[in-house]
Design a protein with these regions (language model features):
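A structural boundary/capping signal
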Residues: 1-120
Length: 120
């Protein structure tokens, strides 16, 4: 079941491009709810959506993945490991690794991402 679930979530997530994280997360969430699976949405926020402070840069891609200060994905426990699925990591990635992929200007100024988790 876990391999099948991961494959189905990956198929959903792979349909979305950069800057479509919200729609991607909603689609995955709806899929899981329809199957009676409770998980959570994980959101990161730079603290500002204005100008350069709203940019979220992805280290592996070498480019911005958000200009509104926000990005989100869905956390799913598979084989005891919490994986995040989003429009960039459609195969799923461990949560701490996912969080470590992002950069924003606030980090250089001593700030950090605001992280919110909402169960569904």
């Amino acid at each position: 079941m876990n391999d099948e679930l991961r494959q189905e979530i990956s198929e959903i997530a792979s349909k979305f491009k950069l800057f479509e994280c919200n729609t991607c997360a909603l689609s995955i969430q709806e899929f899981l709810i329809q199957r009676g699976i409770s998980e959570k949405k994980v959101k990161i926020y730079t603290g500002s959506a204005k100008g350069k402070y709203g940019n979220i840069y992805h280290d592996d891609l070498g480019q911005n993945i958000a200009t509104n200060g926000r990005h989100e994905g869905i956390a799913v426990k598979i084989d005891g490991e919490e994986l995040i699925f989003d429009n960039i990591h459609n195969e799923g990635i461990p949560k701490q690794e996912w969080l470590g992929k992002f950069y924003c200007l606030a980090l250089d100024l001593g700030g950090e991402f605001e992280i919110a988790e909402m169960e569904f």
